[in-house]
UniProtKB/Swiss-Prot annotation:
Its main location: membrane. InterPro entries: ATP_synth_b/b'su_bac/chlpt (IPR002146), ATP_synth_F0_bsu_bac (IPR005864), ATP_synthase_B_chain (IPR050059). GO terms for cellular component: plasma membrane; proton-transporting ATP synthase complex. It is a single-pass membrane protein. It comes from the Bacteria. This is ATP synthase subunit b. It is found in: Cell inner membrane. The gene is atpF. F-type ATPases have 2 components, F(1) - the catalytic core - and F(0) - the membrane proton channel. F(1) has five subunits: alpha(3), beta(3), gamma(1), delta(1), epsilon(1). F(0) has three main subunits: a(1), b(2) and c(10-14). The alpha and beta chains form an alternating ring which encloses part of the gamma chain. F(1) is attached to F(0) by a central stalk formed by the gamma and epsilon chains, while a peripheral stalk is formed by the delta and b chains. NCBIfam families: ATP_synt_b. The chain crosses the membrane at residues 32-54. F(1)F(0) ATP synthase produces ATP from ADP in the presence of a proton or sodium gradient. F-type ATPases consist of two structural domains, F(1) containing the extramembraneous catalytic core and F(0) containing the membrane proton channel, linked together by a central stalk and a peripheral stalk. During catalysis, ATP synthesis in the catalytic domain of F(1) is coupled via a rotary mechanism of the central stalk subunits to proton translocation. Belongs to the ATPase B chain family.
């Protein structure tokens, strides 16, 4: 039995030597020591070189993001101010255009009224002139008709009554005939 126990432990020792050294219990203490030393050295190296570099990068990135946010906020404020200014300018331009349109409309109305008044005055003048021309032509025609009527009346009267009528009597008869014609001129047409 002893030899069987010896053989089992010897086989386990051989197996441990031929296997992974991490599982060899005789080297646990030295492995733990060097693992702790390596870990502490790694932490010190990380703290000394890597963490400050990462911290600097993160701080730089944070400050850059903060600056970009401030710049974006400033640009937003400027854009809002520009928008307000643009809206005010657009409103002012619209009011100006409305005033120009109203002024142009009033000016066109005034010009139209002036042209209308001038045209009406010209038409009244032409009507008055035409009325005067017609009246003058009527007088002239009546004068010519009167002369012809007097002569015809004289000739007819002389032939009818074989009595001579003087010029004054003939004018009186002609005036009477003309008054009769003027009074009945609507019936003649």
């Amino acid at each position: 039995m002893i030899s069987a126990a010896y053989a089992a432990t010897h086989a386990a020792a051989e197996h441990a030597q031929s296997g992974m050294p991490q599982f060899d219990s005789s080297t646990f203490s030295s492995q733990m020591f060097w693992t702790v030393i390596s870990f502490v050295a790694l932490l010190l190296l990380l703290k000394k070189f890597v963490v400050p570099a990462i911290s600097d990068v993160l701080e730089a990135r944070a400050s850059r993001i903060e600056e970009e946010l401030k710049a974006a906020e400033n640009e937003r404020k400027e854009a809002a101010a520009l928008l307000v200014d643009q809206r005010a300018e657009v409103k002012a331009e619209r009011e100006k255009i409305a005033q120009l349109l109203e002024s142009a409309r009033k000016e066109a109305d005034a010009l139209r009224e002036q042209e209308k008044a001038e045209l009406e005055a010209e038409l009244a003048k032409l009507k008055s002139q035409a009325t005067q021309d017609i009246e003058q032509a009527r007088r002239q025609a009546m004068s010519e008709v009167r002369g012809v009527v007097v002569e015809v009346a004289l000739a007819v009267t002389e032939k009818l009554i074989t009595k001579s009528i003087d010029k004054a009597e003939a004018n009186k008869l002609a005036d009477e005939a003309i008054r009769h014609l003027e009074a009945n001129k609507d019936q003649l047409h």
